[in-house]
Design a protein with these regions (language model features):
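Phosphate-binding loop of NTP-binding sites
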Residues: 82-231, 235-243, 275, 293, ...
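Active-site regions of enzymes building and remodeling cell-envelope glycoconjugates
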Residues: 7, 69-77, 142-145, 244-251
Length: 433
């Protein structure tokens, strides 16, 4: 109870709890039910069913009018935050027993944490990974369902990492997770800010709210942690305005603690100068130059030898689904990229344009937008595809609960009149490919 600083406690607290649960359907006798207010439902509406199923305690913002004699009621100001702190305490604060580093930003999170996992594994550590694509304990895969898991699952996963000998863990920290307090109660050794661009306005409402959500991550760091920010993104300084942590910077175009310069960008990789040392990397594009700088800076701030870090980084390949190249027998090249924001799509297409040979091969872009997500970026992404491509095919991504035709109609609004004859709309993604 001290971990959540309750406003009011009613009933006996001298009992051993079963599990911490926020879904009333999963409550068993002896469990603690935390009533969280969500975007789709309010957990307070399910307090009665939770008590009927034998909950030993209810944690909530508004106390119910009545409760069984054997059910303890705990009132808090923020149930979501309390859930995170309770989960951390329940699993004996696993994040304090390893070096946990998180990355937040619009683009680059998955590439950064995945390559950090590979880097530290090659450095000889057992490492945990929490990402959009997958979760890993060492090399053992744990299925991933969200960019950042719920607070209970997250602490359970970190506890499992500790039990299996992990010394480090790297995780993606989404804006949704921060606003929903999924990381409350966690102790971070460090935090990375990659960049911030147009995304998730369907959830946050405004771009300012999106920025504030990301900033929460750095506001919560303690004085022993480090904050590593992309200095070329003007909002990097905003992220660390109120942080107690030690701030370091990386950049390609500004003075920074970890300064990089792209010397050559080819279909085979990047030649870079980082803090005075020239290195060849297998990754492609300026956007990956930023990712590499963030990874390098993080490793050095975690105490690793700079030269050894650069040597290993030069041996690592790109992450699956991030600028993946497939070359057919006839010489046609396909590039697969996760790009799902206007800025990410622009970065990928500009990189492809810069890599075109003297023959100026045609760029055919197949792009779609997800359903039940920020609709304002749909015409923008279509316009970017037209600007940097010779031909464009608008197609389905994951429509979720929307009609694909409605999504494609939104995208079509961004097609310039002089590009209309270069654009096809094919809803079936397989057919488009």
């Amino acid at each position: 109870l001290p971990a959540i600083n309750p406003v009011k406690v009613q009933g006996d607290t001298s009992f051993v709890i079963g599990q911490i649960v926020f879904d009333s359907r999963k409550v068993a006798a002896g469990d603690v039910f935390v009533a969280v207010r969500g975007t789709q439902a309010d957990g307070h509406a399910f307090i009665a069913p939770a008590m009927e199923r034998g909950a030993a305690a209810i944690v909530c913002e508004t106390l119910p009018e009545a409760a069984p004699d054997n059910c303890c009621l705990v009132q808090v100001t923020n149930s979501a935050e309390a859930l995170g702190k309770l989960a951390a305490a329940y699993y004996d604060y696993p994040s304090q027993k390893l070096k946990l580093t998180g990355i937040t930003g619009t683009n680059g999170k998955t590439t950064t944490v995945t390559l950090l996992h590979q880097l530290f594994t090659r450095l000889g550590y057992k490492v945990g990974l929490i990402s959009t694509i997958r979760n890993l304990i060492g090399e053992k895969e744990i299925p991933a369902t969200h960019t950042t898991p719920d607070a209970v699952s997250l602490n359970a996963l970190l506890a499992q990492m500790v039990a299996e000998g992990c010394t480090h863990a790297f995780m993606e920290v989404s804006s949704h997770a921060l606003v929903q307090y999924r990381t409350a109660g966690l102790n971070f050794a460090g935090a990375i800010f990659s960049n911030i661009t147009h995304d998730h306005l369907d959830y946050h409402g405004t771009f300012d709210a999106y920025i504030r959500a990301k900033k929460m991550f750095f506001d919560g760091l303690d004085k022993n942690a480090f904050a590593l920010i992309n200095k070329d993104d003007k909002r990097g300084a905003v992220m660390v305005q109120n942080t107690a942590s030690k701030v370091s910077t990386f950049a390609l175009h500004s003075p920074a603690d970890f300064k990089g310069k792209v010397l050559a960008n080819t279909v085979r990789g990047l030649q870079m100068e980082i803090n005075g040392k020239q290195v060849w990397f297998r990754l492609i594009g300026d956007f990956n130059a930023y990712n590499l700088l963030g990874i390098y800076g993080t490793a050095v701030l975690l105490g690793e030898d700079a030269e050894q870090v650069l040597t290993i980084l030069s041996q690592l390949d790109s992450v699956q689904g991030r600028f993946d190249r497939i070359v057919a027998a006839n010489g046609t090249t396909a590039i697969i990229d996760y790009a799902h924001t206007p800025d990410a799509l622009k970065n990928v297409l500009q990189t492809i344009q810069s890599l075109r040979g003297q023959r100026k091969e045609s760029i055919i872009t197949i792009v779609g937008c997800g359903g039940n997500r920020d609709a304002t970026k749909r015409p923008v992404m279509a316009a970017i595809a037209c600007q940097f491509s010779d031909r464009v095919m608008l197609t389905s991504d994951n429509p979720r609960f929307e009609k694909p035709e409605a999504i494609l109609a939104d995208m079509k609004k961004g097609v310039p009149a002089d590009a209309a004859d270069r654009v096809q709309i094919i809803a079936d993604r397989r057919q488009a490919i």
